[in-house]
């Protein structure tokens, strides 16, 4: 289950970055949103030099799964 519609359309790192920032808007409080936005930005910078297409697809898949887990975690708490 994807956290937001359109997860299956994410193919590039920039699309992933924008998708994850949109996911952050679904989080309950401003503080939590800012925390995860910062984490997304940091991860994007860390992996910005990645050029292996296979590895990029692994990162995209894992990031979407992680976003799903985080959104489900906060939905259960509310």
Swiss-Prot record:
It holds the Pfam family Complex1_LYR. Belongs to the complex I LYR family. LYRM9 subfamily. PANTHER family: LYR MOTIF-CONTAINING PROTEIN 9. This is LYR motif-containing protein 9.
């Amino acid at each position: 289950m994807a956290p937001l519609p359109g997860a299956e359309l994410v193919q590039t790192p920039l699309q992933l970055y924008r998708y994850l920032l949109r996911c952050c808007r679904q989080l309950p409080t401003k503080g939590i949103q800012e925390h995860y936005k910062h984490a997304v930005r940091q991860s994007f910078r860390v992996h910005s030099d990645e050029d292996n297409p296979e590895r990029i697809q692994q990162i995209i898949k894992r990031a979407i799964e992680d976003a799903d887990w985080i959104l489900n975690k906060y939905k259960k708490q509310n």
